[in-house]
From Swiss-Prot:
The name this protein goes by in its record: Casein kinase I isoform alpha
Pfam families: Pkinase
Organismal lineage: Eukaryota, Metazoa, Chordata, Craniata, Vertebrata
Sites where the protein binds ATP: I23, G24, S25, G26, S27, F28, G29, D30, I31, K46
GO molecular function: ATP binding; protein kinase activity; protein serine kinase activity; protein serine/threonine kinase activity
N-acetylalanine found at: A2
Keywords, ordered alphabetically: Acetylation, ATP-binding, Cell cycle, Cell division, Cell projection, Centromere, Chromosome, Cytoplasm, Cytoskeleton, Kinase, Kinetochore, Mitosis, Nucleotide-binding, Nucleus, Phosphoprotein, Serine/threonine-protein kinase, Transferase, Wnt signaling pathway
Length: 337
């Protein structure tokens, strides 16, 4: 067991979930693989120190409860306190899209990008129908399921989510400026950089940058050097604003530029036309003669790796993933997928 999780050995939470090993870190805490000792089922456990300066696991657990039942929303098993921790027990999921991008040597085919776009738009739309915006749309926060859910995309990490309208009155939050940037600068909308209160349009614009990240391998505002975080954010913002959508999307189907221009043109309170955006990509998908068969790029690679492993007389090295760019975290997240 890794030293980081050594102190958690024999740590049982919620009366029946025994921690096994650390499998990742969220924005505000560590995530562990755990086993339900009553039936052997594997689950994920998110731990947050009760001494955390900005505790948010209770808030996140409440949000998951509001979202329960939605397609691609993890099921919550238990929330409570154990020893010095706030604890959230939820479905165990597979690797993130960032992990899978690395697994595929940081190249996704257009077919994979378009199949993902369809599910990603639907996940964000569902959160919006529940009166919340996510505010941290990025590849790390989309995870594939496992087992019978292995082709289903899940949206996670609602610690930064915010209610944008009242459940009963449907009153939208007011337009404001001078807000600090919430979320991840690489994928943040231009308005978020400008300090404008986020709304539905910003989640959708962020998704546009995620899709172009997958298409291009990187975004023009990645890798900028600066002395401070604030200066780096300013450089990212400047580069993002000075890169025309047509330049960002050059060499890729026009639908990606259409998507981003549409999102950037939305008014603060305006509801995005999710079906229009899905149809943009669905029609492109059909035009390119692809079949919606859930055969993603990693599906093929996993099959190849399994065949290599089988034909290499049990030498585990042959089954290694085909890129040297992974972290140990990527490897651990790919196991059992």
């Amino acid at each position: 067991m890794a030293s980081s999780s050594g102190s958690k050995a024999e740590f049982i939470v919620g009366g029946k979930y025994k921690l096994v090993r650390k499998i990742g870190s969220g924005s505000f805490g560590d995530i562990y693989l755990a086993i339900n000792i009553t039936n052997g089922e594997e689950v994920a456990v998110k731990l947050e120190s009760q001494k955390a300066r900005h505790p948010q696991l209770l808030y996140e657990s409440k949000l998951y409860k509001i979202l329960q039942g939605g397609v691609g929303i993890p099921h919550i098993r238990w929330y409570g306190q154990e020893k010095d921790y706030n604890v959230l027990v939820m479905d165990l999921l597979g690797p993130s899209l960032e992990d899978l991008f690395n697994f595929c040597s940081r190249r996704f085919t257009m077919k994979t990008v378009l199949m993902l776009a369809d599910q990603m738009i639907s996940r964000i739309e569902y959160v919006h129908t529940k009166n919340f915006i996510h505010r941290d749309i990025k590849p790390d926060n989309f995870l594939m399921g496992i087992g019978r859910h292995c082709n289903k995309l899940f949206l996670i990490d609602f610690g930064l989510a915010k209610k944008y309208r009242d459940n009963r009155t449907r009153q939208h939050i007011p337009y404001r400026e001078d807000k600090n940037l919430t979320g991840t600068a690489r994928y943040a909308s231009i308005n978020a950089h400008l300090g404008i209160e986020q709304s539905r349009r910003d989640d959708m614009e962020s998704l546009g940058y995620v899709l172009m990240y997958f298409n291009r391998t990187s975004l023009p505002w990645q890798g900028l050097k600066a002395a401070t975080k604030k200066q780096k954010y300013e450089k990212i913002s400047e580069k993002k604003m000075s890169t025309p959508v047509e330049v960002l999307c050059k060499g890729f189907p026009a639908e990606f530029a259409m998507y981003l221009n549409y999102c950037r043109g939305l008014r603060f309170e305006e509801a995005p036309d999710y079906m229009y955006l899905r149809q943009l990509f669905r029609i492109l998908f059909r035009t390119l003669n692809h079949q919606y068969d859930y055969t993603f790029d990693w599906t093929m690679l996993k099959q190849k790796a399994a065949q290599q492993a089988a034909s290499s007389s049990g030498q585990g090295q042959q089954a290694q993933t085909p890129t040297g760019k992974q972290t140990d975290k990527t490897k651990s997240n790919m196991k059992g997928f």
